[in-house]
Every structure is written in structure tokens, then in C-alpha cells.
Amino acid sequence: MAPLLLLFLLGGLCALFSLASSSPATKKCGDAKKRREEEGEEVVVVAKKRPEEEPRRPDPDADLGIVFSTFDHDGDGFITAAELEESLKRLGIAVSSAAEAAALVARVDANSDGLIDIHEFRELYDSIPKRRKSHQQHPLPSTAAADEEAAAADEEYEAEEEERDLREAFDVFDGNKDGLISAEELGTVLESLGLRQHGGRPAVAECRDMIRLVDSDGDGMVSFEEFKRMMTVVKA
């Protein structure tokens, strides 16, 4: 999988992570329940949703910051070529050499300091969908039939390319290669990326919440088809 596309997929994952792990109503209810239990009261909680509450929407700025922090290992606000190379290796994405990692950095390093800051990272992240559509095209005679044929060929090429990329991304999460992503497998990937809830290891329950957002058949797993639908939504 192209390392640049990986950044886009991580953005979708982080959006799901933030949606599943931060529900204000759930947190307030849990805090109140804990206080009353500490005071010795028997507590029965019935979850209710206030009429004025709306489902939490992903915050693009916050999600981008989470993705950035997974690569910025030392937290200094910059991504080095070495940090980029190490992050990709954690996910099983091979980088052939340090020079290749440096070349990836150089592609967006506007001030030529050898580092990627958050602004350069945003420019890279926003450009990824456009890059996917910029493959080389062979010129054809400019006729209506030729234009229609070229458009169909482009759509087919793009669909095949996206299918391959998504399959490779899916395989990163599917640790045992059974064709399904479990909560445990998702937690392992989150941990490898440094995405931890409240500074600790991602709880399996939180990973189940993430899966529930995209699990259309209710089996507690994410199939490849569900994974593709998920990525279609987060890229929209």
C-alpha cells in the first residue's frame, strides 16, 4: 500500500476512534454512577438521550492531530524521516531505505528543513484523494466515443487500484488473516499506532464500540465489505 494512502486511512480510523471513545452523555452518566457506588448506594442506570443532543460528528482538526501524533514519536511538533519510517514499519508497510523515507518527507517539506510540521502534514493529507486520481492517462482521439471509452477505462482503473489499496489496508488490521477484523485485532493496531484511551491501552470494549459503528450484520467483526463501506463514508 502506498504510504500516502495509509495516512488517509489512518484519518478514518482516528475519526472512528474519537467517535466511539468520547460520548459526553455516557461519560457523565458513568461518573455519577461511580460516585453513588462509592457512597454505598445501589445504582440502576437507564441510559437516556436528551432530545436536544445530536450524534457527535468527527472533528477533522482533532482527527488530523491524532494522526500526526502517531508519527511524531517524541512530541516535538515535527515528523522526521526516521519517525515516518518507523511508523510505517510498525504497520508492516515496508520502506526500502532511509532515502525513500527522506524522499516522502521532501515531497511536502515546503521550507526544506527536512521535517514535516502540522501545516505541511495537512497539505499532504488533503491532497491524497487527488493524488489517487492523477495516474497517467494515454491520449486518445478526441471523439465522443473515445472520450466515453477513456472515462470508463479511468473509472475501472481507479476502482481496481482502490480495491487493492483497501485490501492491503484491511490486511494490516486482520492479524490472523481469517478475513475478519476483531476487537482484539483492532486494539493491537491502535496500540501500535500509539492511540490509547486516557493514556492507557485501548480497552476491548472501546474497540467493540468502534466496530459496532460499521458492523452491518451484527457479528461483532468487520468484514472486508464493511471495511470498504466504512472507508467510503470517512472519505466522503
From Swiss-Prot:
Region (Disordered): 43-64, 130-158
Keywords: Calcium, Metal-binding, Repeat
Protein residues bound to Ca(2+) 4: D215, D217, D219, M221, E226
List of residues binding Ca(2+) 3: D174, N176, D178, E185
Ranges of compositional bias, category Acidic residues: 146-158
Residues the entry annotates as binding Ca(2+) 1: D72, D74, D76, E83
Residues reported to bind Ca(2+) 2: D109, N111, D113, E120
Residue span, EF-hand domain: 59-94, 96-131, 161-196, 202-236
Compositional bias of kind Basic and acidic residues: 49-60
Entry's Gene Ontology molecular function annotations: calcium ion binding
Stored PANTHER family: EF-HAND CALCIUM-BINDING DOMAIN CONTAINING PROTEIN
Function: Potential calcium sensor.
Name by which UniProt lists this protein: Probable calcium-binding protein CML30
Lineage of origin: Eukaryota, Viridiplantae, Streptophyta, Embryophyta, Tracheophyta
